[in-house]
Regions:
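Beta1/beta-strand and adjacent pyrophosphate-binding region of the FAD-binding site
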Residues: 34-46, 163-169
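Short, hinge-like loop/turn segments at secondary-structure boundaries
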Residues: 79-83, 123, 142
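Beta1-alpha1 glycine-rich phosphate/pyrophosphate-binding loop at the start
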Residues: 40-103
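Short hydrophobic core segments
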Residues: 64, 120-128, 168
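Catalytic cores of nucleotide-enabled group-transfer and carboxylate-activating enzymes in metabolic
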Residues: 51, 84-91, 105-110, 116-122, ...
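Cysteine-cluster motifs in flexible loop/terminal segments that predominantly coordinate metals
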Residues: 1-35
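Glycine-rich dinucleotide-binding loop and its adjacent helix/turn
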Residues: 18-31, 95-96, 104-106, 127, ...
Length: 169
């Protein structure tokens, strides 16, 4: 992670969780002059940070995600050996959501009727990323057999890897 990697490289520390880290005197969160209703769509790292900062500034915030839990890709990342500390990051955000008063709506699809019904002043889309397909010729024919896998297939235990593995991408 950038927090330690940058320090060891004698660069300014940065943080995946706290965008102000290393810039506390420059990046100040001022109270909002006009309180607004925000919908933040996506409860991954970006959505969590956005929702809590907006609420901290005095806005009314609904955080919507179709998943049953917060975290987005962090829920996969913390399954990687040596990356278990991401679970602590999610614990931190759960607490921040409580303290800042963000209204968390899990299992909620944020389609147009839902967003219109919410009468939001602003909508922030923080829906995250999907894995890039390296478009290897012939790979599509091998996916169903488990011979070509995405990282989520392995981390979620859908398939086991054999003794010989090539990582591409």
């Amino acid at each position: 992670q950038a927090c330690l990697d940058h320090v060891f490289q004698r660069r300014i520390a940065s943080c995946l969780v706290n965008p102000r880290a290393g810039h506390e005197t420059e990046l100040r969160y001022e109270p909002a002059q006009t309180r607004k209703r925000f919908a933040v769509v996506g409860a991954g790292p970006a959505g969590l940070a956005c929702a809590t900062v907006l609420a901290e500034r005095g806005h009314q915030v609904d955080l919507l995600d179709s998943a049953a839990t917060i975290g987005g890709q962090f829920n996969l990342a913390m399954r990687v050996p040596g990356k278990e500390e991401f679970a602590e990051t999610l614990r931190y955000f759960r607490r921040r959501l409580q303290v800042t008063g963000v209204n968390v709506r899990l299992g909620a699809r944020a389609d147009v009727p839902v967003l219109r019904a919410g009468r939001y002043d602003e909508v922030v889309l923080a829906t995250g990323v999907t894995a890039r397909d390296p478009e290897i010729p012939g790979a599509d024919a091998q996916r169903d057999s488990g011979r070509v896998l995405g990282y989520a297939d392995v981390l979620l235990g859908r398939y086991e890897c054999g003794p010989r593995v090539a990582v591409v991408g």
